UniProtKB/Swiss-Prot annotation:
pH dependence remark: Optimum pH is 6.5 for ATPase activity (in presence of microtubules).
Name under which the protein is recorded: Kinesin-like protein KIN-14Q
Binding site for ATP: G457, Q458, T459, G460, S461, G462, K463, T464
Basic and acidic residues: compositionally biased ranges: 844-855
Primary location recorded for the protein, binned into one broad class: cytoplasm
Limits of the Calponin-homology (CH) domain: 33-155
Function summary: Minus end-directed motor protein that transports actin filaments along microtubules. Plays a central role in the polar orientation of actin filaments along microtubules, and thus a contribution to the organization of the cytoskeletal architecture. Links the actin microfilaments with the cortical microtubules in both cycling and non-cycling cells. Required for efficient cell elongation by its participation in the premitotic nuclear positioning.
Length: 954
């Protein structure tokens, strides 16, 4: 009986040990979880939820390890406790990467953070851990201990006293250990006492619980089997004998169940052991068989190694051979490269020489153009507009001086037509390229030449863009106007020590055949174009503003552009509805010699020709288009007449041709920009424009001449003007004598006959630089037959004669053998001689002129006052063919006819001559006789009638 009880007691003790092991493991896992939760909670509260977003509030061991393995949370927590402990914390590369994918930081980055953290923790003498503890399979308990020690250290720093737990884990009070013991006891007792009466079990368990509750901390160190034995003895000691079998039976049933369970486990373990033995036998068999295979593999490997070793030796030999061959090739190529370098050097020198020769040829070509006086024509192709790019272009090819147009069959058989000009700019050309090619022409204005640049083409072809630029200006998009003026002011600054320049600007427009001033806001006052411009001013009534810098000119141009007539059509949303002209007047004075020079530059932006069916204009826009096309048609007629060298040039058909008369027919350097559009639907207008440009390029104007005059000539002209004013005042005439700065339509008398001075008969180049009174005379419009009907009288007042005594000898007029020789004036004033001539000219008879075979005639024959020209700055040309001889006064005074307009009576004005002390006063003019039809001047003062008879005045 007692032996059975002992066996049962031993069985119970074994069962209790097994249960105790399970409970201890469970308790330990729960304790570790609580410590881990505490550490995670403290880290989240210390560094913040955002920084510790990868660390849950109650993490598992794997989540805790992944949340701390990059070291960011640990380093930030340590910096919170010890500011600046870790100066640099390597942050994650991407916040978007999850913490569990293993790609947030590279191994080096989180190893750097962890190493810095462990160094600081070790310096603080706190528990540390290894970096491998944060890897999978590491000891996470040491990490938790380190975090909790850091927490205790932080709390001690805050409170100023040492914490209850010295840098360890959670502090466990005594009640906690009692709690776990009671819990384990309850589990065991519930297991072994099931099935007994509730009252007995409860009473006995209460006694056992009271005993266990009184245990001290030292009694908890006792083994569990001893305590259970004592407990069972106490329970069975007081029981009745009849109750013991029931209790023992219950315990035995439980033991039997446990035994059967263990037997099942043992059987399973035996099966696994048998399987393990089988596997071991198989492994041994494989090992035994594998020894032969290994030996065979080693033999094959050795053989392969020997073969590869041999191949390596062969490769080393081949490499040595290749190296020697490469060295030879290197030397050979070095020699070849040296030869190529010399050859390229020769080619580069040849190319440089070629470019120099090409530049010299261009300069020579420009000089030839200057000598011939051809109008230079530059062609520019507009690029496609944004959003309107066509699939194909009408421009087939562009070269330096040639443009080829794809034409329909009606324009050519081969489908292409080429045009040649002085320069051709493609669609990709810039404003800088366009201006650089014409820059020498611009600079000649400061040398005293007149220059005219005008843009021609259909509407929307880019004329305003070339001349002015786009609506929003940039440094790269500035047009010809701005760049030309900027260049003028730069040269002015460079020559300020030699020449003193004064620059002034005019800006006008021709709108519906009306000349308007663009520099006056709201100024619709109609201006007139003078056929004999004074001081280079074709429109003297327009505002002329002095300028000193490019900024002043830009401001004036902006004001003019605002006042210019601009409208929108179906072809162009910013179409110019008028012709604009920017005139830049330059007057310079040499600081050393005092000589004067004068130049003028006209920058003309023509309105584009347009077809009404395409532009879809109505009303005022239609009227504007009609005026524009009419003026451009008149320009075409003028160009055609000049190209064919016709005797009649219709300048007066339009205000535009009147304005350009001095540039097209005078002594000026002229450049025309012709613009074409690349669209296929505009090929008709393109070909028409290019044909017109070809006609313009064929016009020869003769060599241009600089407007220069010496200081002595200028002083003499001023004296003559003063004397003329005094004479006019004395005779009671209106003081309308003006400074002689331009040459009217006069005739130069040569030996034997009279030759009209036409614009194309310019002075030779050797006379260009002479400092004499040469001005841009307005071309003569019609050849007038003038009658020289008076000479200076000899009975003038003595006071005027005294005013003329200081005039030096400036001109000479030799009379005899039908010859006039002209220097700077008609008459030669010797010392002591006094002459005050005033010439008047009679308008010729058109009918009679057509009956006679005369030289070239022009269209502009407006009368002008002879007082506006002086004998000191003009070359007088007299045509004696068909002259009407006026009677000469008996006392030697000539009667000279003034020019008359239509339906105006011809009046004669007698001008007395001053007393002449020189032999000049004794001479009489002899009229040169060209042919038998000419009649000599009558010395009796009579005049010839229509039938050839001479009426003598009574």
């Amino acid at each position: 009986m007692m032996a059975a009880a002992v066996e049962e007691e031993e069985m119970v003790e074994r069962m209790h040990g097994w249960a105790r092991d399970m409970d201890v493991a469970s308790r330990r896992a729960e304790e570790e979880a609580m410590r881990r939760y505490d550490a995670a909670s403290w880290l989240r509260s210390t560094v913040g939820v955002v920084c510790a977003r990868d660390l849950p509030d109650e993490p598992s061991e794997e989540e805790f390890r992944l949340g701390l393995r990059n070291g960011i949370v640990l380093c930030n927590a340590l910096n919170k406790i010890q500011p600046g402990a870790i100066p640099k914390v390597v942050q994650a590369q991407s916040d978007a990467a999850g913490p569990t994918d293993g790609s947030a930081l590279c191994a080096y980055q989180y190893f750097e953070n962890l190493r810095n953290f462990l160094v600081v923790v070790e310096d603080l003498r706190l528990p540390t851990f290894e970096v491998s503890d944060l890897e999978k399979g590491g000891k996470g308990v040491r990490v938790v201990d380190c975090v909790l020690a850091l927490k205790s250290f932080s709390e001690s720093n805050k409170t100023g006293r040492q914490a209850s737990c010295k840098y360890g884990g959670l502090s466990k009070p005594l009640t906690a250990r009692k709690y776990f013991i009671l819990k384990n006891t309850d589990a065991f007792m519930n297991k072994i006492m099931k099935g007994h009466s509730a009252e007995a079990i409860q009473s006995e368990f209460s006694e056992g619980q009271s005993i266990v509750t009184d245990f001290s901390i030292e009694s908890n160190e006792m083994t569990t089997s001893d305590s259970l034995s004592i407990l069972l003895r106490k329970v069975l000691l007081d029981k009745k004998p009849e109750e013991v079998p029931l209790i023992v039976e219950s315990i035995l049933s439980k033991v039997i169940q446990e035994y059967e369970h263990r037997i099942a486990i043992q059987n399973k373990m035996d099966e696994e052991e048998q399987n393990l033995l089988n596997i071991t036998e198989q492994v041994n068999h494989v090992v035994v068989n594998g020894d032969g295979e290994v030996k065979q593999f080693q033999l094959e490997a050795q053989t392969n190694f020997d073969v590869q070793q041999k191949q390596i030796q062969e490769l080393k030999g081949a490499l040595s051979f290749v190296k020697s061959g490469m060295e030879q090739l290197r030397l050979q190529y070095s020699e070849e490269f040296a030869k190529l370098g010399k050859h390229f050097y020769t080619l580069s020198n040849a190319a440089s020489s070629y470019h120099k020769v090409l530049e010299e040829n261009r300069k020579l070509y420009n000089q030839i153009q200057d000598l011939k006086g051809n109008i230079r024509v530059y062609c520019r192709v507009r690029p496609f507009l944004p959003g309107h790019r066509s699939l194909s272009s009408s421009v087939a090819d562009t070269e330096e001086r040639t443009i080829t147009i794809i034409t329909p069959t009606k324009y050519g058989k081969d489908g292409c037509k080429s045009f040649s000009f002085n320069r051709v700019f493609g669609p990709a050309s810039t404003q800088e390229e366009v201006f650089s090619d014409m820059q020498p022409l611009i600079r000649s204005v400061l040398d005293g030449f007149n220059v005219c640049i005008f843009a021609y083409g259909q509407t929307g072809s880019g004329k305003t863009f070339t001349m002015s630029g786009p609506k929003v200006l940039t440094e790269e998009s500035l047009g010809v106007n701005y760049r030309a003026l900027n260049d003028l002011f730069n040269i002015k600054a460079q020559r300020k020590g030699t020449i003193d320049y004064e620059i002034s600007v005019q800006m006008i427009e021709i709108y519906n055949e009306q000349v308007r001033d663009l520099l006056q806001d709201g100024g619709n006052r109609r201006l007139e174009i003078r056929n004999t411009p004074q001081k280079g001013l074709a429109v003297p009534d327009a505002s002329i503003v002095p300028v000193t810098s490019t900024a002043d000119v830009v401001e004036l141009m902006n004001q003019g552009q605002k006042n210019r007539a601009v409208g929108s059509t179906a072809i162009n949303d910013r179409s110019s509805r008028s012709h604009s002209c920017l005139s830049v007047h330059v007057q310079g004075k040499y600081l050393t010699s005092g000589a004067m020079l004068r130049g003028c530059m006209h920058l003309v932006d023509l309105a584009g020709s347009e077809r009404v069916d395409k532009s879809e204009v109505v009303g005022d826009r239609l009227k504007e288009a009609q005026y524009i096309n009419k003026s451009l048609s008149a320009l075409g007629d003028v160009i055609a007449s000049l190209a064919q060298k016709n005797s009649h040039v219709p300048y007066r058909n339009s205000k535009l041709t009147q304005l350009l008369q001095d540039s097209l027919g005078g002594q000026a350097k002229t450049l025309m920009f012709v613009h074409v559009s690349p669209e296929l639907d505009a090929v008709g207008e393109t070909i028409s424009t290019l044909k017109f440009a070809e006609r313009v390029a064929s016009v020869e104007l003769g060599a241009a001449k600089a407007n220069k005059e010496g200081s002595e000539v200028r002083e003499l002209k001023e004296q003559i003007a003063t004397l003329k004013a005094a004479l006019a005042k004395k005779e009671g005439e209106p003081e309308n004598i003006q400074s002689t700065q331009s040459s009217p339509d006069m005739y130069r008398i040569k030996r034997g006959n009279a030759i009209p001075a036409f614009p194309k008969n310019r002075q030779p180049m050797e006379e260009v630089g002479n400092l004499e009174v040469r001005n841009n005379a307005t071309p003569m419009q019609k050849k007038a037959s003038f009658q020289f009907s008076g000479v200076l009288s000899e009975n003038n007042s003595s006071d005027l004669a005294e005013n003329c005594n200081g005039i030096q000898k400036t001109d000479r007029m030799a009379v005899g053998n039908n010859q006039f020789e002209n220097g700077n004036s008609i008459l030669e004033l010797e010392p002591g001689a006094t002459q005050l001539p005033t010439f008047f000219y009679q308008r010729y008879d058109p009918d009679k002129q057509r009956r006679r075979a005369e030289p070239v005639e022009t269209d502009d024959s407006d009368s002008f006052d002879a007082a506006t020209s002086s004998p000191s700055d003009q070359e007088m040309l007299l045509s004696t063919s068909g002259l009407k001889a006026d009677g000469i006064a008996s006392r030697g005074a000539f009667i000279i006819k003034k020019p008359q307009t239509k339906n105006t009576k011809i009046t004669a004005t007698k001008i007395p001559n001053l007393a002449m002390k020189s032999p000049m006063s004794e001479k009489r003019l002899q009229t040169p006789i060209r042919n038998s039809k000419q009649l000599p001047f009558s010395t009796t003062g009579g005049r010839r009638t229509r039938n050839g008879k001479i009426n003598t005045p009574k």
